[in-house]
Amino acid sequence: MVDNMFIVFEGIDGSGKTTQSKLLAKKMDAFWTYEPSNSLVGKIIREILSGKTEVDNKTLALLFAADRIEHTKLIKEELKKRDVVCDRYLYSSIAYQSVAGVDENFIKSINRYALKPDIVFLLIVDIETALKRVKTKDIFEKKDFLKKVQDKYLELAEEYNFIVIDTTKKSVEEVHNEIIGYLKNIPH
């Protein structure tokens, strides 16, 4: 029996993760999912990110961890049947919340149950380009903050061996083909 793959896309808003994760899921006939999830906790997180409700950054980190517990159950169930492609996962929490001032070790400790992805694609982009691409504004979309988050993602890429793809000057098709090229070289 071939194990199904858990593939994660990370990057700041406007990097192309949602577009690319959906394209890949369609091509692979995989289950597509995202964080924050559709759980009750995920809906609360979206309220906070939209600026409708305010909470402490540590509280937000805990909410993301709680949402991830529920989400991981769904991912594990789907992996029994097919590949899973996820738009954001644990590394978004580490990048965004640590830049917002939450201790990185705290974030990692409350997420220690998280499923380890088989592969993580980090899509990076010029900050100006990202801001032009973004359709919805949330509390994290400030230029200097996004730069710090992307820098943190690049640190995580070193630590966790992400595949980094710069989407700034590439078409959707070029990025998709690059992703497919990487996947062809992975035993599956």
From Swiss-Prot:
Catalyses: dTMP + ATP = dTDP + ADP
Q: Where does ATP bind?
A: G11, I12, D13, G14, S15, G16, K17, T18
| Gene Ontology cellular-component annotations | cytoplasm
Picking any one GO biological process from the record gives:
dUDP biosynthetic process
Q: Say which domain of life the source belongs to.
A: Archaea
EC number, as in UniProt:
2.7.4.9
Q: What are the entry keywords?
A: ATP-binding, Kinase, Nucleotide biosynthesis, Nucleotide-binding, Transferase
According to the UniProt entry, its GO molecular function terms are: ATP binding; dTMP kinase activity
UniProt xrefs under Gene3D superfamilies: P-loop containing nucleotide triphosphate hydrolases
Bilayer-spanning residue ranges: none
- Show the NCBIfam families listed in the entry: DTMP_kinase
User: Which family does the entry's similarity section mention?
Assistant: Belongs to the thymidylate kinase family.
**By what name is this protein known?**
Probable thymidylate kinase
Species of origin reads: Methanocaldococcus jannaschii (strain ATCC 43067 / DSM 2661 / JAL-1 / JCM 10045 / NBRC 100440) (Methanococcus jannaschii)
